[in-house]
From Swiss-Prot:
Gene3D superfamilies linked to this entry: 3.30.160.20, 3.30.70.1660, 6.10.140.1950
Plastid found in the keyword field: no
GO molecular function: translation release factor activity, codon specific
Sites bearing N5-methylglutamine, chain numbering: 233
Protein name per UniProt: Peptide chain release factor 1
Record carries keyword Transmembrane helix: no
Family membership: Belongs to the prokaryotic/mitochondrial release factor family.
Keywords: Cytoplasm, Methylation, Protein biosynthesis
One Pfam family here: RF-1
Organism: Orientia tsutsugamushi (strain Boryong) (Rickettsia tsutsugamushi)
PTM summary: Methylated by PrmC. Methylation increases the termination efficiency of RF1.
PROSITE patterns found in the cross-reference section: RF_PROK_I
Amino acid sequence: MSFTVHLNKILQKYQDLEADLNGGKLDNKELALISKEYSNLKPIIEKLNRYLKAHENIKYLQQVIDTEQDLELKSIAEVELYDTLNYLPKLEEEVKISLLPKESDDHKNAIIEVRAGTGGDEAALFAASLFQMYNKYAERKKWKFELLSISDTEIGGCKEASALISGNGVFANLKFESGVHRVQRIPKTESNGRIHTSAATVVVLPEAEEVDVKIDAKDLKIDTYRASGAGGQHVNTTDSAVRITHIPTGVVVSQQDEKSQHKNKAKAMKILYARLYDLEKQKSKQEQAISRKVQVGTGDRSERIRTYNYPQGRVTDHRINLTLYKIEEIIQEGKLDEIINNLISENEAKKIADSNIQF
């Protein structure tokens, strides 16, 4: 099927849906389904109409230039034609992006997990800085940031921390943050001024509901125990902490931040659903090799994706060779949009190249 035929089919489908909605013959269920499909097509049609209108304008302006005797009008048409031809590639790109299949999890909320890696106390401090960076980024995006768990260290770092981030387009924006983040800086305790390298791992999971993944109660092993603080001392006199093991996969989730065992169990189950759902998605991606071609980076969570170099004030994303000298703004203020927008654009470009959409 040619691309022009494909576009005409989309336009016809949109017009048919519009006629159905205005016909007044739909029951509530049909109305809801058709309204959703119509809403999904609307932004595509708007971009497509702008593209088609630009093409019509080019033909008209070319005709004016070829036939107009008035030199002033001819000159105006030439300028407008030049501007329209320069703008056309951007319109083409917008249409192509709108026609790409939407990733099924992009609309979901996300659970973000940060774990200290190699580097001892420095790694724990870096993990805490990253976790705070995502908190600040969520504030900037007007998203809700709900702490799920945190394992603090005595010097203000954290061994691991997780949060549920809720809002519009959360997973679509944060999904490229998964991987190994590396920091290069001089520790405060370093008397010789040597630069140390530490690392932390970030995992971003789409929030999963019970409808997304089936968990059989008999497959769960649930243990309770007393919560402990940073120094290992018990901070609660009751067995409020919960550890849930999913026996078939071996996935283990522990939760102790709440004083209530019931709340800890609910949070642990939320994380468990997300991890099991992610396991299924990762397995599916591995089975479909083509999905690897359209990812920014390898998609492997052991991949080093970004370096934060404090002496140079530099942040480098290795997947797209992007370097910004804004380390304080990024880490302290959560100004991640420039990095994330570039990652999204690169991913879209790879998808377009892989889809072979031609005008």
